[in-house]
Amino acid sequence: MEQTFSDMSVQMAVERAGASELVMMVAKDVHDVLRPNEFVLEFADTTSPGFHSALAVTNYRMLIGVGPGQLQEIAVDSVTRVDAVRAPEVTLLVRVYNADVTVYGLGDRGLRRIFHAFNWIVSQNAARPAHADPENSIADMYNEWIDVQRFLHENPDVSDEEGNQRLAGMVANKRWW
């Protein structure tokens, strides 16, 4: 296949996905929005947005083509679980904190590639450096924790979901580790 993209991660992922016309269209959109130090791990065909499209997994985001020049974005840092359901059709269930994102129409091959990409991301996140200098100190984390607790006690009408989101957002903040 001739080289279409200047970013080799996009080029190689497109080739692995089969380089269909729709994958190429979404790949161009993904190529245009790549951030510094971001690279594409895999592409796969999907029918998730209600029509034939493609899904990309990068080292930072999952991107689904939802229209010409439009991508739905899910930060991989917010993904807490990835599951597959094979009946009645192959479906990818991506758990984002307390919500599920369902991706339909991947096919077995696409599902395997997307799972492989997520497994790589998990393995990289699990292999944290032995020594890290967090942006903020333990005292800062404690103070933010107290602020969240104070807010929850001063606002008893806050729903459990909102309270959980505030706590999860504070704990998941990568400045702490």
Predicted features and spans:
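Cysteine-dependent deubiquitinase/ubiquitin-like isopeptidase catalytic cores across multiple families
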Residues: 32, 38-40
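Polybasic phosphoinositide-binding surfaces of eukaryotic membrane-targeting domains
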Residues: 50-64
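Acidic, Ser/Thr- and proline-rich intrinsically disordered linker/docking segments
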Residues: 2-31, 45-50, 66-177
